Design a protein with these regions (language model features):
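Thiol-based oxidoreductase modules, predominantly thioredoxin-like and allied folds used
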Residues: 37-42, 63, 75, 86-106, ...
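Local sequence-structure signature of Cys/Sec-based thiol-disulfide redox active-site neighborhoods
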Residues: 25, 44-85, 175-211, 460, ...
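Alpha-helical bundle/repeat cores within regulatory domains of eukaryotic proteins
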Residues: 443-564
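Cleavable N-terminal signal peptides of Sec/SRP-targeted secreted and luminal proteins
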Residues: 1-15
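N-terminal leader/targeting and pre-domain segments
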Residues: 12-58, 88, 97, 109, ...
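Short, low-complexity cationic-aromatic patches
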Residues: 49-54, 69-70, 74, 85-90, ...
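A short, hydrophobic beta-strand/beta-hairpin element that forms part of a small beta-sheet core
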Residues: 59, 78, 114-134, 232-260, ...
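Non-globular targeting/processing and membrane-anchoring segments
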Residues: 15-30, 156-454, 474, 508
Length: 576
């Protein structure tokens, strides 16, 4: 049997990526060839980032997943950062890699990508992933720019690259001839710019030096502190200030406070005539979608259903890719979490769909359940249930290989190349995996209830806690994970809110609506699938959040009426 290329040595010829280079892979990306973001893939990462030439830049790389809500929210800021510091590209460049694409799995794992977005700064002439430094995904452009600046300056302080700006503060001098000696290193420059700063920790001067890099042949730039002798000679009182001298002159050709320069720019903007933006143009897609669902509820209703394709696609990605993302072994709490989630999938994944009085077997899901059973048993054979399973170490490579064998023996029940169904977004960057995962959670909870609704002593917590544990240890979107854990443990704790067995599905319904309320109106909201409080009126006209007696039967019917994945299951291979 041939295993997928995931486990074969890479035979891809190495290439160097540049602005406008389209990445290899099949997944949608959050960046385009028009952005000032260099898009990396498995074939270009090493040659680009681990460049050995003397003129190589350093790199800032975002490892992201196209399905990750936080990554989608962060992408506009990252594009803005790339555009803002594009003039620094001889010093540092901005790159990105989509870890959701299987072609990039090995590189993302080698870089220890524990969550998304995961940002690393690679100094010039980095040699391997360990040379990268983890950065934070700040919320503002200034914070991101300052963070990059600090790492560039740290890089310079160690290596002092001659073709980078000289970030050292100008030494004290008593004559202008000493100043011109500073320019002598750059014989073509006819001017010298000096940024006088208030404090050694200020980053303004360093950023301006890199902003001026494109003019380096005409303008030599340095920075100085407010106690420099030139400050008194030039009568400077406000900082930061910019002074530009022509070579050989003693009187500056430009002298201005940066605050005044910025104010003048704002003033010019305010006095310019701007085209009036028609407010009716804004948010057109969202408005149209909302009006459509009010005026034509049946048309909107047809877009909402539970799909076996969506669930199986999401489950396969969750089990095969998310568990192995970092390359960290399965041991202790994460091993327990994976075993618990596989057990829940085996016990509660719906294998039958109910449409009215009609009942139909979901053949693909039935086959998938055998995969979950095999993987659960395999983990138990390895010691997952041992009281001291911290001492058990299972490599994720071995786990993936076993999963692929189990999948093949079950007739390959999981859709891989098939598109998302109900979870297909209005663009390729919308919905997808996160939608499929939520759908799976809801369907598991409704099936669990149907299986035991007459058992009065059943607890809703085993399934709910298995879902939470899997999210805690394996879900890649850091922001989403943190919100989910905070909600389910603090703001809406499942141990307190889920008391009756019917809460096994009612709790998840309420929790999902909390998430929808938080995300409503954001850029990540698909205009064709607005973040309604579920169910929307066009799905259930008499449902209200305060009346669980109407919500309960609706949810049971909705998550039991599953659109089957109709492609036939391959003949199962009985060989282990």
């Amino acid at each position: 049997m041939l295993l997928p290329f995931l486990f074969l040595p890479s035979l891809i010829l190495a290439e160097v990526a540049d602005y406008g280079t389209p990445p290899k892979g099949i997944n949608p990306t959050l960046y385009s060839v028009d952005d000032k973001v260099i898009q990396l893939d498995e074939s270009t990462f090493n040659e680009t980032i681990f460049c050995t030439r003397s003129d190589c830049p350093s790199y800032l790389v975002e490892f992201y997943s196209d399905w990750c809500g936080h990554c989608r929210s962060f992408a506009p800021l990252y594009k803005q950062l790339a555009k803002d510091i594009n003039s620094w590209n001889n010093v540092v460049r901005i790159g990105a890699m989509n870890c959701a694409d299987s072609v990039n799995a090995a590189t993302c794992r080698a870089n220890g990508v524990a969550y998304f977005p995961y940002i690393k700064y690679f100094p010039r002439n980095s040699s391997d992933p360990t040379t990268g430094t983890l950065l934070r995904a700040f919320r503002t452009l200034s914070e991101m720019r300052d963070q990059v600046t600090k790492h560039v300056m740290d890089d310079y302080s160690v290596n002092r690259f001659e073709d980078w700006p000289n970030f050292d503060f100008l030494k004290d001098m008593t004559t202008f001839s000493e100043l011109w000696e500073e320019v002598g290193a750059n014989e073509t420059a006819e001017h010298i710019a000096i940024v006088f700063e208030n404090h050694p920790s200020s980053l303004t001067g360093a950023q301006l030096l890199m902003d001026l890099l494109p003019y380096n042949d005409r303008l030599y730039s340095r920075r100085a502190l407010k106690n420099h002798p030139l400050v008194e000679a030039l009568h400077l009182t406000d900082f930061p200030s910019l002074v530009i001298f022509k070579k050989g002159d003693r009187v500056p050709v430009v002298q201005a406070e940066l605050r005044r320069l910025l104010f003048n720019e704002v003033e010019q903007f305010l006095h310019e005539e701007k085209e009036e933006v028609d407010p009716t143009i804004q948010f057109t897609a969202r408005k149209n979608a909302s009006e459509e669902c009010i005026n034509e509820p049946e048309k909107c209703k047809a877009r909402y259903y539970v799909s076996e394709v969506d669930m199986l696609k999401a489950i396969r990605y969750a089990i095969l890719r998310e568990t192995a993302r970092t390359g960290a072994p399965l041991s202790g709490s994460n091993l327990t979490a994976l075993h618990g989630f596989l057990s829940s999938l085996h016990d509660h994944l719906p294998t039958v769909t109910f449409h009215g009085d009609e009942e139909q077997t979901l053949n693909r899901s039935s086959a998938a359940v055998t995969v979950f059973a095999r993987m659960r048993d395999w983990l138990e054979e390895k010691g997952a249930l041992a009281s001291d399973n911290d001492s058990i170490v299972i490599s994720v490579d071995d786990f993936q290989k076993e999963f692929l064998l189990a999948e093949e023996n079950a007739g390959n029940p999981f859709p891989i190349t098939i598109e998302w169904d109900h979870c297909k977004g209005s663009t390729r960057q919308m919905r997808g995996y996160s939608c499929g995962l939520w759908t799976t959670f809801h369907a598991l909870s409704v099936t669990a209830y149907r299986q035991k609704e007459n058992e009065t002593d059943s607890s809703p917590l085993p399934l709910l806690t298995s879902i939470r544990s899997w999210v805690e240890h394996f879900f890649g979107c850091l922001h989403c994970r943190d919100h989910f854990l905070r909600m389910t443990t603090k703001t809406f704790p499942m141990e307190i809110e889920a008391k009756k067995f019917e809460d096994v599905f009612l709790y998840l319904w309420k929790a999902h609506n909390v998430v929808n309320a938080r995300l409503k109106g954001r850029d990540t909201e698909d205009p064709m699938f607005l973040k309604y409080q579920f169910p929307a009126r066009f799905l259930c006209s008499n449902c209200t959040a305060s009346d669980e007696s109407t919500i309960k039967p609706f949810l049971i019917n909705y998550y039991s009426d599953i659109k089957p994945y109709t492609a036939p299951v391959e003949k199962a291979n009985g060989n282990k």
